[in-house]
């Protein structure tokens, strides 16, 4: 699973996800991509589940690029603990994804296979997604 090797601060602020993604809105490496149409946090487990769903459908053919990385930690207090007495312990890692960001890219397979593989991956994610193609240069 994807986790940072080391971080400066273990506990981060939640932050706000306003507007669209600044970069990474076009398909850069592959031929086809999966673009987010809503903003959300995506956990490292969701990214891994989407990757497995894609590679299983493509039967190890083609190449997959994961263009998001879970660099932000999120915390949670234990169940049954009252409010107060500090921030909770780090629970996991998330990648904040804004709308318009291309999260996954695929190359080396036909469009039908890529479309279905990315559709299966989108079912594992908490964001609404759309299939995008690389623009002709």
Swiss-Prot record:
UniProt entry keywords in alphabetical sequence: Ribonucleoprotein, Ribosomal protein, RNA-binding, rRNA-binding, tRNA-binding
CDD domains, sorted: Ribosomal_L16_L10e
A GO cellular component entry from the record: cytosolic large ribosomal subunit
GO MF assignments: rRNA binding; structural constituent of ribosome; tRNA binding
tRNA processing keyword on record: no
Superkingdom per UniProt: Bacteria
Family: Belongs to the universal ribosomal protein uL16 family.
Name used for this protein in its record: Large ribosomal subunit protein uL16
Species of the source: Streptococcus sanguinis (strain SK36)
């Amino acid at each position: 699973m994807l986790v940072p090797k080391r971080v400066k601060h273990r506990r981060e602020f939640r932050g706000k996800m306003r507007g669209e993604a600044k970069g990474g809105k076009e398909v850069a490496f592959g031929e086809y991509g999966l673009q987010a149409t809503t903003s959300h946090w995506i956990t490292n487990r969701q990214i891994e589940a989407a990757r497995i769903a894609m590679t299983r459908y493509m039967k190890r053919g083609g190449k997959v690029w994961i263009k998001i990385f879970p660099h932000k930690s999120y915390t949670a207090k234990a169940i049954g603990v009252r409010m107060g007495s500090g921030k909770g312990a780090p629970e996991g890692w998330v990648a904040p994804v804004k709308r318009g960001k291309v999260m996954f890219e695929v190359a080396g397979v036909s469009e039908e296979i890529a479309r279905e593989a990315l559709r299966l991956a989108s079912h594992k994610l908490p964001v609404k997604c759309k299939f995008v193609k690389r623009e002709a240069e």
